[in-house]
């Protein structure tokens, strides 16, 4: 009985870590730049991402420093 309970707990722990990591880690090498602006609105800190996937990946991995898409193309 203890072994079964332990096994269930381990499986739940593994499932939690696997489900929590939904961030895209591999993006294509296509260069279709997008300009992002910090979610706080500081336009002087705009940043060009290689593509939409790069911006999405950054936002997923950096919850406290996210960017909103400002426009397609490089930031000027």
Curated annotation (Swiss-Prot):
GO terms for molecular function: calcium channel regulator activity; toxin activity. Expressed by the salivary gland. Residues 1-21 form the signal peptide. GO terms for cellular component: extracellular region. Keywords: Calcium channel impairing toxin, Disulfide bond, Ion channel impairing toxin, Secreted, Signal, Toxin, Vasoactive, Vasodilator, Voltage-gated calcium channel impairing toxin. Disulfide bonds join 23-60, 27-53, 35-75. Residues 22-76 form the Kazal-like domain. It is found in: Secreted. Pfam families: Kazal_1. InterPro entries: Kazal_dom, Kazal_dom_sf. One of its GO terms (biological process) is vasodilation. PROSITE patterns: KAZAL_2. The keyword Ribosomal protein does not apply. The keyword Ubl conjugation does not apply. Vasodilator protein that inhibits vasoconstriction of isolated rat femoral artery induced by phenylephrine. Since platelet aggregation and vasoconstriction are key hemostatic responses, particularly in small wounds, this protein likely participates in the antihemostatic responses during blood feeding. Blocks L-type calcium channels (Cav1/CACNA1) in left ventricular myocytes isolated from rat hearts. This is Vasotab-TY2. The lineage of its organism: Eukaryota, Metazoa, Ecdysozoa, Arthropoda, Hexapoda.
């Amino acid at each position: 009985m203890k072994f079964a309970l332990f096994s269930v707990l381990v499986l739940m722990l593994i499932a939690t870590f696997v489900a929590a990591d939904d961030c895209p880690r591999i993006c294509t090498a296509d260069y279709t730049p997008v300009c992002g602006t910090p979610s706080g609105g500081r336009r002087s800190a705009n940043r060009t991402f290689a593509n939409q996937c790069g911006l999405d990946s950054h936002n997923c991995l950096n919850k406290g420093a996210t960017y909103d898409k400002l426009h397609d193309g490089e930031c000027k």
